Amino acid sequence: MSTPFKMERGVKYRDAAKTSIIPVKNIDPNQDLLKKPEWMKIKLPASSAKIESIKNGMRRHGLHSVCEEASCPNLHECFNHGTATFMILGAICTRRCPFCDVAHGKPLPPDPEEPQKLAETIQDMKLKYVVITSVDRDDLPDRGAGHFSECVKAVRELNPNIKIEILVPDFRGRVTQALEKLKDNPPDVFNHNLENVPRLYKEIRPGADYGWSLKLLREFKEMFPNIPTKSGLMVGLGETNEEILQVMQDLRDNGVTMLTLGQYLQPSRHHLPVARYVPPTEFDEFRDKANEMGFEHAACGPFVRSSYHADLQASGGLVK
């Protein structure tokens, strides 16, 4: 009889240790993988000085970026431009989504000094637009919403002219309570990712619920009708184009005005494999459909991620 897997608090579990406890066993690390097409190859910048500067600044203040923790393919480009997406509430997620490279485990309690550290780091970096996201914190009574609110408050106090976008989890089972905490310090853009299509949620987003996510986006929009709401999707996980179009329509029906759509990339052999690589022309077609549906801004392209050039997205610029 095998010994049950026991996690230690504060320890990051990745790759096989993470995926071994996912309910749906659908990952074979030895399977053949699709060859990456030419359009998915990234040219790295010649200099890494700016990249190291941002990494060192994060370490100095004990902060995390989702760019590093989730192994984002755009890290070099964004860091080289002096931008980063800050990840609050630690670097250990209570969920274990098999598409995501963020570590799973039992997280430590929130750092009460993190809001001030975040505000000071943003001030040091002289940012005009910032994205703040977090891991899922299903272990907290408010799922981390109060900490989000405190971070927004601290950042605004020290950086009065900044624009703030928050990319939030689904606040599992606590949507109403979470929004009550967020309403005291609302962002300039409210972002929550649906990720993919409801048919694949059990496989892709164990612990999440498509209806909860739509409810969160809808109720925030009802509370703050003048604040843009935004959501992101990945393609290449086994969905059909028709299913993606239906999700896009569901987003519009729930008041979402900004969309990001990008190619899923497998972080390691212990994550879900890429089912197909979507060519750039199809992303252009998705963007055209999004415009027809009434999205005010749609960033669609192979390397587009939820916070990729978020400042340009918010100002209405073309991102692809």
Swiss-Prot record:
Its cofactor is [4Fe-4S] cluster. Keywords: 4Fe-4S, Cytoplasm, Iron, Iron-sulfur, Metal-binding, S-adenosyl-L-methionine, Transferase. Binds 2 [4Fe-4S] clusters per subunit. One cluster is coordinated with 3 cysteines and an exchangeable S-adenosyl-L-methionine. It is found in: Cytoplasm. PROSITE patterns: RADICAL_SAM. The keyword Transcription does not apply. It is an enzyme of class 2 (transferase). The keyword 4Fe-4S applies. GO terms for cellular component: cytoplasm. Its EC number is 2.8.1.8. It catalyses: [[Fe-S] cluster scaffold protein carrying a second [4Fe-4S](2+) cluster] + N(6)-octanoyl-L-lysyl-[protein] + 2 oxidized [2Fe-2S]-[ferredoxin] + 2 S-adenosyl-L-methionine + 4 H(+) = [[Fe-S] cluster scaffold protein] + N(6)-[(R)-dihydrolipoyl]-L-lysyl-[protein] + 4 Fe(3+) + 2 hydrogen sulfide + 2 5'-deoxyadenosine + 2 L-methionine + 2 reduced [2Fe-2S]-[ferredoxin]. SMART domains: Elp3. GO terms for molecular function: 4 iron, 4 sulfur cluster binding; lipoate synthase activity; metal ion binding. Residues 79-296 form the Radical SAM core domain. Pathway: Protein modification; protein lipoylation via endogenous pathway; protein N(6)-(lipoyl)lysine from octanoyl-[acyl-carrier-protein]: step 2/2. [4Fe-4S] cluster 1 binds at C67, C72, C78, S307. InterPro entries: Aldolase_TIM, Elp3/MiaA/NifB-like_rSAM, Lipoyl_synth, rSAM. [4Fe-4S] cluster 2 binds at C93, C97, C100. Belongs to the radical SAM superfamily. Lipoyl synthase family. NCBIfam families: lipA, PRK05481.1, PRK12928.1. This is Lipoyl synthase. It comes from Haemophilus influenzae (strain PittEE). The lineage of its organism: Bacteria, Pseudomonadati, Pseudomonadota, Gammaproteobacteria, Pasteurellales. The gene is lipA.
